[in-house]
Amino acid sequence: MFRFNNVKNIVMKKIKYVIYKEGKYYVSQCLNVDISSFGTTIDEAAANLKEALQLYFEDDKSHLDYLSISEALIGETQLYLK
């Protein structure tokens, strides 16, 4: 069981992310900060992203890059390029 020694320093961050398939891997992309990861399954991609985010937020100044997102939608469009 994980215990927090100093609960006053614990901050919860709500994280929004998307997962998409690229080749044989699933890519997990965080929308709040520029962090991504991947895995061979959706669950693995999500778990790997969570681990990467925990490492990222260990930096005392990483919270400055955090963008709070209350709602996220996925859209699709077509572009005609020359």
Question: What are these model-derived regions, one by one?
Answer:
Residues 18-30:
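Short aromatic-glycine-(Arg/Gly/Cys) micro-motifs in beta-strand/loop hairpins
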